[in-house]
């Protein structure tokens, strides 16, 4: 196998990079030493920022995320018994999205296996 880029690590970042490179016509292979069961079974963060949502859309894997995620406009912080709302939408004009990184990984693995640039996972 000949490729232009080798990406070490088949988590969400490596898979996303691989997909974005493919969309630009740059051949690559994503190498992962763990099993698919391990990679897809580990618990990861569940909040992603708008810029990541935009990257996932650009990579072609945003459809399920758009359908199943929850938009979250802010958080509440308690200090000395008083709750304070931090409204992201009002402060910066953006929200965060509740969609687990494990789900992002599932979406990216499905796409990478179609492109056949993911090595190491028994998909």
Predicted regions and their residues:
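Beta1/beta-strand and adjacent pyrophosphate-binding region of the FAD-binding site
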Residues: 1-13
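Glycine-rich FAD pyrophosphate-binding loop
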Residues: 8, 20-44
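Cytochrome P450 catalytic-core helices
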Residues: 16
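Short, well-ordered alpha-helices that flank and scaffold nucleotide-derived cofactor binding pockets
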Residues: 19-23, 110, 114
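Short phosphate-binding/catalytic loops that engage adenosine nucleotides
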Residues: 26, 61, 117
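Structured helix-beta-strand junction loops
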Residues: 36, 71, 114-115
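Active-site-adjacent segment of FAD-dependent monooxygenases/related oxidoreductases
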Residues: 41-45, 49-111
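A conserved beta-strand/loop element that lines the FAD pocket in flavoprotein oxidoreductases
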Residues: 112-123
């Amino acid at each position: 196998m000949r490729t232009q880029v080798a990406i070490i690590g088949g988590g969400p970042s490596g898979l996303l990079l691989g997909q974005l490179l493919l969309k630009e016509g740059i051949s690559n292979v994503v190498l992962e030493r763990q099993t698919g069961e391990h990679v897809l079974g580990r618990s990861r963060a569940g909040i992603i920022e708008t810029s990541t949502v935009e990257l996932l859309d650009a990579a072609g894997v945003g459809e399920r995320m758009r359908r199943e995620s929850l938009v979250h406009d802010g958080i509440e912080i308690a200090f000395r018994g008083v709750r304070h709302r931090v409204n992201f939408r009002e402060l910066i004009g953006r929200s965060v999205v509740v969609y687990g990184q494990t789900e992002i990984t599932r979406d990216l693995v499905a796409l990478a296996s179609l492109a056949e640039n993911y090595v190491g996972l028994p998909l």
